Amino acid sequence: MIHSLFLINCSGDIFLEKHWKSVVSQSVCDYFFEAQEKAADVENVPPVISTPHHYLISIYRDKLFFVSVIQTEVPPLFVIEFLHRVADTFQDYFGECSEAAIKDNVVIVYELLEEMLDNGFPLATESNILKELIKPPTILRSVVNSITGSSNVGDTLPTGQLSNIPWRRAGVKYTNNEAYFDVVEEIDAIIDKSGSTVFAEIQGVIDACIKLSGMPDLSLSFMNPRLLDDVSFHPCIRFKRWESERVLSFIPPDGNFRLISYRVSSQNLVAIPVYVKHSISFKENSSCGRFDITIGPKQNMGKTIEGITVTVHMPKVVLNMNLTPTQGSYTFDPVTKVLAWDVGKITPQKLPSLKGLVNLQSGAPKPEENPNLNIQFKIQQLAISGLKVNRLDMYGEKYKPFKGVKYVTKAGKFQVRT
């Protein structure tokens, strides 16, 4: 299936490659680099690229491209899902999936890739099994390995490999038993010039951190589970129970994992938490223009909207901008023509604004279109869809665990047209 894997940074450097069958030359990545140059943004590089002798299937994660080389036709989503699993494993092992972390742990990276794929086909992808096969790096283990010449590869086969619940290792014991859940929702929206919503959708995930002894059986119920669409489950979820009762019933993996991801596609259920008043104008046959935007809370359910940033890709004829913010600070890059306004948090009592003059190239024609505003924000302790966890029940063990739920709403691709 997968012949080779190349890891490429944003500068276009191939800093790691792994081959499972015959060695594929790095020159095959030239097709990927051509597609990258044509793409308007790094996230818009086609995930599947056809070449005369290969298929290149890639993902973009944490400023890195994972590019796999395929010689026969396979379902692309299958390969994409596996590449995401590789990135998740690096994140779990090293704390971050970055070029520096991968280079610092390059031996463990190759050991993991060797275990995750057998002759190019997925074999062991569950984190609990991999951690029994290959021990996660620690400072003490690194020192011992350098002195003794040993490796992080385990001496025994993982106990869960042949189990009917391979995602959980046996003999788990904790002094403090805890079960925490993070409900994280991202709003993707397009707002037109008049402030009306053209498109709105919520992408949500529930991430779990489970540190429970033994073999607990958990049931997680919600106040309003019917609003969820296109739910994707971790393999531990009993799907029939969800279909009949809308309850998540599962024996959890040990540690951190993604329990479900979901979508709320009904625009009536998507509350837009911020509004933007804008006035951007360029005069014909003039070397200046006006820029005026104000941002405020709209539907925040009584919570504070924080971490607000506004990014604007100005037209190429813009030379400079002389603006005055009532809150926060702004920067303008005259080379990339990108205006970035770091607002911070907002309250209804004081609405932040950014206004001033725009300097244009002398004699240049008036820009045909006004720029779009890209908004980023975060709201703590709020799931904007209204999703709420009702209760968590545990069976099979007699102790009482600590339980907690945290809600976060943030902007995904949130665009305001001017």
From Swiss-Prot:
Keywords: Cytoplasmic vesicle, Golgi apparatus, Membrane, Protein transport, Transport
Record-level GO BP terms: anterograde axonal transport; anterograde synaptic vesicle transport; clathrin-coated vesicle cargo loading, AP-3-mediated; intracellular protein transport; intracellular transport; melanosome assembly; platelet dense granule organization; postsynaptic neurotransmitter receptor internalization
GO cellular component, one term: axon cytoplasm
Residues forming coiled coils: none
InterPro entries documented for this protein: Adaptor_comp_med_subunit, AP2_Mu_C_sf, AP_mu_sigma_su, Clathrin_mu, Clathrin_mu_CS, Longin-like_dom_sf, MHD
Main location class: Golgi
Places the protein is found: Golgi apparatus; Cytoplasmic vesicle membrane
Assembly and oligomerization: Adaptor protein complex 3 (AP-3) is a heterotetramer composed of two large adaptins (delta-type subunit AP3D1 and beta-type subunit AP3B1 or AP3B2), a medium adaptin (mu-type subunit AP3M1 or AP3M2) and a small adaptin (sigma-type subunit APS1 or AP3S2). Interacts with AGAP1. AP-3 associates with the BLOC-1 complex.
Family, per entry: Belongs to the adaptor complexes medium subunit family.
Chain's role: Part of the AP-3 complex, an adaptor-related complex which is not clathrin-associated. The complex is associated with the Golgi region as well as more peripheral structures. It facilitates the budding of vesicles from the Golgi membrane and may be directly involved in trafficking to lysosomes. In concert with the BLOC-1 complex, AP-3 is required to target cargos into vesicles assembled at cell bodies for delivery into neurites and nerve terminals.
Name of the protein described by the UniProt record: AP-3 complex subunit mu-1
Species, as recorded: Mus musculus
